[in-house]
């Protein structure tokens, strides 16, 4: 079994926050792949289903962000999972809005949800870093992540979530490159090819110059007029 965790804060008040993009990601996977209903378990809510050959449990911790590791640790102990079975979807200030990066292991970079997970299960798990951009000053970070996405963000956000759902099966089987390609196709769809075999219209030929019938003396005189 694989455990996909989306980080966020519970309740309608936080539903549209930038900090909740992890919740949004696993919700998109559940919806696109016909997962079962969400039910309360492991200090959060879970939904079960299959992605290709893999049985996958989706988890949204409801401990609030800073205690996410309690929920994740409980689920992993129940199913006897290792960090290699865990992938966490979370917001990333250090990536531009709409950018996505995969990471295996490493530090938490100050993210309180990851910090809590580190404390409960170690750091050797996978992450899907979902770019939300940075407000420009560290003092503005808290209010920035706890505010909703702007209307101008909705286009790329919807494309990103669709791409995550498209590539979820590849991610579950460990094919990170194919997962990222699925997201890229949603974010930057290929340009339509020009029809082959159509010849470009020929440029119109310049009209031939009329023959110069002036005498040499006339041409010389015209130069000084």
UniProtKB/Swiss-Prot annotation:
GO cellular component: cytoplasm
Any single biological process term in GO: rescue of stalled ribosome
GO MF annotation list: peptidyl-tRNA hydrolase activity; tRNA binding
Positions of the UniProt region annotated as Disordered: 187-225
Active-site residues per Swiss-Prot or TrEMBL entry: 19 (proton acceptor)
One Pfam match: Pept_tRNA_hydro
Catalytic activity: an N-acyl-L-alpha-aminoacyl-tRNA + H2O = an N-acyl-L-amino acid + a tRNA + H(+)
EC number(s) recorded for this UniProt protein: 3.1.1.29
Function description: Hydrolyzes ribosome-free peptidyl-tRNAs (with 1 or more amino acids incorporated), which drop off the ribosome during protein synthesis, or as a result of ribosome stalling. Catalyzes the release of premature peptidyl moieties from peptidyl-tRNA molecules trapped in stalled 50S ribosomal subunits, and thus maintains levels of free tRNAs and 50S ribosomes.
Protein name: Peptidyl-tRNA hydrolase
Top-level taxonomy: Bacteria, Pseudomonadati, Pseudomonadota, Alphaproteobacteria, Rhodobacterales
Gene: pth
């Amino acid at each position: 079994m694989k455990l996909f965790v989306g980080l966020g804060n519970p309740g309608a008040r936080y539903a549209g926050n930038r900090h909740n993009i992890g919740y949004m990601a696993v919700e998109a996977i559940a919806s696109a792949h016909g997962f079962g209903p969400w039910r309360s378990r492991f200090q959060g809510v879970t939904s079960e289903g299959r992605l290709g050959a893999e049985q996958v449990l989706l988890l949204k911790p409801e401990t609030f962000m800073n205690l996410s590791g309690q929920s994740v640790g409980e689920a992993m102990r129940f199913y006897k999972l290792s960090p290699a079975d865990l992938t966490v979807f979370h917001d990333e200030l250090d990536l531009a809005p709409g950018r996505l990066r995969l990471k295996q292991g490493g530090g938490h970079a100050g993210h309180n949800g990851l910090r809590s997970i580190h404390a409960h299960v170690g750091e050797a798990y996978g992450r899907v870093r979902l770019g939300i951009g940075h407000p420009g000053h560290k003092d503005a970070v808290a209010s920035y992540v706890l505010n909703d996405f702007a209307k101008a963000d909705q286009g790329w956000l919807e494309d990103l979530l669709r791409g995550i759902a498209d590539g979820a099966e590849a991610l579950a089987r460990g094919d990170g490159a194919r997962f990222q390609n699925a997201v890229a196709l949603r974010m930057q769809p290929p340009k339509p090819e020009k029809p082959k075999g159509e010849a470009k219209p020929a440029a119109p030929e310049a009209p031939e110059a009329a023959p110069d019938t002036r005498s040499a003396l006339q041409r010389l005189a015209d130069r000084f007029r």
